[in-house]
Amino acid sequence: MDFRLSTGSNLPREALGKLLYDIICDVLVMELSFDEIEVKDWSDSRHISIGFTYFSISINLDDEDDYIERYRKLNLETYGVDTNVDINIQFIARTFDIGWLKLLEVIGKLLRLNDQDLVVEDDSSYPLLKRIKGCLFINSNLDEFQTECMGKEKLELLNYPYLEKDFLKDNGHEK
């Protein structure tokens, strides 16, 4: 299962990769030994990948400035979020249920670090959640699987206040 987390960041992407590694280690400190976490930094491709039992994340450090700007404008026009870093998330299917909970904890820690915009997307047309100018919105117009993933008990793992919002309705489309 593929997801994408896009965020605004003033950090260099290398520093953001290190920060994500530290957050993941903090979230999983009681569950994993450090030999279960694999970090790759391919110098020739300038790509950071962090993989472990539940999911892997990757950040492309080679993105050109014009690509980043086009991507930023697209997210601003489509979702109303100002982001400049794209983080790909690949879940391991057999551990998705636990991995999703761990990712929510990681996202919660990111939310508390700064007030930058953020959006989390799956393969649907509308994001699962987004933060705009410090306010977190959870999509209330979800399919059955998404509703299970975004239940109130699971969202408590974010440890961050949020409002529910129908992203489909608020985008001018009918359900």
Residue ranges and their predicted role:
Residues L5, I57-I59, I87-I89, L103, ...:
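Hydrophobic beta-strand residues in large extracellular and virion-surface proteins
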Residues V29-R94, I132:
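Short, intrinsically disordered low-complexity segments
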Residues M1-S45, G172-K175:
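Short, extreme N-terminal segment that most often corresponds to the first beta-strand
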Residues D22-V27, V106-N114:
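Conserved short hydrophobic interaction patches
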Residues L11-P12, I92-G99:
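Short acidic, S/G/P-rich loop/turn micro-motifs used as interaction or catalytic elements
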Residues G8-N10, T53, L142:
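Secondary-structure transition/turn motif
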Residues G17-L20, D97-K109:
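Well-ordered, non-membrane alpha-helical segments in soluble/globular domains
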